[in-house]
Amino acid sequence: MDAQNVEEVGKRVDFVFCAVNMKKDEIKALEEAYAKAEIPVVSNNSANRWTPDVPMVIPEINDAHLEVIEAQRKRLGTKRGFIAVKPNCSIQSYVPMLTPLLKFGIKEVVATTYQAISGAGKTFNEWPEMIDNVIPYIGGEEEKSEQEPLKIWGEVENGQIIKAVNPIITAQCIRVPVTNGHM
């Protein structure tokens, strides 16, 4: 079944989990097409993470952000369809631990992640130069690791999520020569 055939897929499902390998603008259009077809979308992709009325949810931390779905439905003209996203995989390891510490006024966080090649969607067969190698900078990952927690810790105002301004997060994301797993 072709994931881009929204009409055909829509006949067979009640909702979709979206984890496709496409350009961001194509993913955004595809997810909106599903939502507009009244099919709820839970996305693993980053395309809609910064859409103001799309909740980026870690349920035990910010389930109140789900209330923006009503504003999103108005924008999309839907009754049932919506898009919700999960955050970057690396921040799911440290945001739950940091969240209770926010009440103590932490001002700065320094985070370092060690990410397997699977996080880049690759294997050693496809990326032999990674064998016995470490890449000390992963383009785009540091920005996600520094900014996405602020959306998760943000507040809902007028149907949009306004990101928090603190703590300031500095991240270093390193690609390591292991097949699966992030630390």
Language-model-detected regions and their locations in the chain:
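N-terminal Rossmann-like NAD(P) cofactor-binding subdomain of oxidoreductases
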Residues: 1-130, 134-137, 161
